[in-house]
Curated annotation (Swiss-Prot):
Gene source species: Edwardsiella ictaluri (strain 93-146)
Pathway(s) annotated for this protein in UniProt: Purine metabolism; AMP biosynthesis via de novo pathway; AMP from IMP: step 1/2
Name the UniProt record assigns to this protein: Adenylosuccinate synthetase
Entries under SUPFAM superfamilies matching the protein: P-loop containing nucleoside triphosphate hydrolases
EC number: 6.3.4.4
Gene (name only): purA
Length: 432
């Protein structure tokens, strides 16, 4: 048998998954995106050169690695084409390395229009979506009216289906949201221009992955967003529209649950969040500003400033449970360099004075809770670029050890910088 390794975020996204996937794919045959869409922003730095991927898996820069966009991903044709063009201009043979599932739902311009119209209508209660049509595309999928990549094999039938669904959505746009309708012909022309390209990359992804596993191949499954944004288990309604937890791997790609061998949870050494929603450890002081500036905490997809705060071990423990995590990769440890002290949230104090060590299930339950902190000594030495565990300051090692103790999960990888080489691998997921 082969080995299937899942890499996913344990917080609210932006944990550094792209770099880690790129690093680990040195030993993988396939890298698979199984949920989300081009609302992801995975940043890779290789030999100082920065690449930001939104839809294409992070393994695309590796020779002899096949990248797959599986059925759980909502696919925007224009975004895919744009990303492919940018990579090909840099000499990356994307068409030789990328495969698609025919079951991928398509994100089309009317989804984007709906997304933005809804956010505007929510006013102060806006979710803070990326405005890229992700949610409306998933809605169409669940309502069984969505168009999929496989529909492009019959272009005449696709045109008819598109007209029907656009009449439905344009009625909403014009009569409920009071915005302009989306032009049918322009959408049809846009999709037809890339239809042959998309269908040329289609394979039976589930069959391919199951055969690869039986044949001893190593496969990496790349999560997007983070556990606390999961549609079912996140801080609802301030969540994304897909299952970001490990359970989404099986439904989003077509492998069975028992075929997952190792789940690597990416945990940032502090916490960040983009957009609205609960964030108990959020900092509004100079330390929060320090983390934002030093950590360059601006969204790779939207450019929005990320909210920053101390590490929330209560929330991370929820991620441990939801994903059956095998190990952690701790990222951005170097951002904490220079602080006099570092804090870990180990519990919450409710408005009525009770103390709990588990996260609420919905956004309303987070209102008024206060973090309970453990305070540890900081370190002045630089951890940036350190490649051996023994090269880390003792205070940093103590911080890592305490994270392991309060979560019950070992830190198997430590990231000390953005480049793939700036990493300490204590236990490789494919060897675990």
């Amino acid at each position: 048998m082969g080995k299937n390794v899942v890499v996913l975020g344990t917080q609210w996204g932006d944990e550094g998954k792209g770099k880690v996937v790129d690093l680990l794919t040195e030993r993988a045959k396939y890298v698979v995106r199984y949920q989300g869409g081009h609302n992801a922003g995975h940043t890779l730095v290789i030999n100082g050169e920065k690449t930001v991927l939104h839809l294409i898996p992070s393994g695309i820069l590796r020779e002899n690695v096949v990248s797959i966009i599986a059925n759980g991903v909502v696919l925007a044709p224009d975004a895919l084409l744009r990303e492919m063009t940018e990579l090909e201009a840099r000499g990356v043979p994307v068409r030789e390395r990328l495969l698609l599932s025919e079951a991928c739902p398509l994100i089309l311009p009317y989804h984007v229009a709906l997304d933005n119209a809804r956010e505007k209508a929510r006013g102060a209660k806006a979710i803070g979506t990326t405005g890229r049509g992700i949610g409306p595309a998933y809605e169409d999928k669940v309502a069984r009216r969505g168009l999929r990549v496989g529909d492009l094999f019959d272009k005449a039938s696709f045109a008819v289906k598109l007209k029907e669904i656009m009449e439905y959505h344009n009625f909403q746009l014009v009569n409920y949201y009071h915005v302009d309708a989306v032009d049918y012909q322009s959408v049809l022309d846009e999709v037809m221009a890339v239809a042959d390209l998309l269908t040329s990359m289609v394979v039976d992804v589930a069959d391919l992955l199951n055969k690869a596993y039986r044949n001893g191949e190593y496969v990496m499954f790349e999560g997007a967003q983070g556990t606390l944004l999961d549609i079912d288990h996140g801080t609802y309604p301030y969540v994304t529209s897909s299952n970001t937890t490990a359970g989404g791997v099986a439904t989003g790609s077509g492998i069975g649950p028992r075929c997952v061998d190792y789940v690597l949870g990416i945990v940032k050494a502090y916490s960040t969040r983009v957009g609205a929603g609960p964030f108990p450890t959020e900092l509004f002081d100079s330390v929060g500003e320090f983390l934002c500036e030093k950590g360059n905490e601006f969204g790779a997809t939207t450019g929005r400033r990320r909210r920053t705060g101390w590490l929330d071990a209560v929330a991370v423990r929820r991620a441990v449970e939801l994903n059956s995590l095998s190990g952690f990769c701790l990222t951005k440890l170097d951002v904490l360099d220079g602080l006099d002290e570092v804090k870990i949230c180990v519990g919450y104090r409710l408005p009525d004075g009770r103390e709990v060590d588990v996260t609420p299930l919905a956004a309303e339950g987070w209102e008024g809770i206060e973090p309970i902190y453990e305070v540890l000594p900081g370190w002045k030495e630089s951890t940036f670029g350190v490649k051996l565990r023994d090269g880390l300051p003792q205070a940093a090692l103590n911080y890592i050890k305490r994270i392991e103790e309060v979560t019950g999960v070992p830190v198997d990888i430590i990231s000390t910088g953005p480049d793939r080489e700036e990493t300490i691998v204590l236990r490789h997921p494919f060897d675990a």
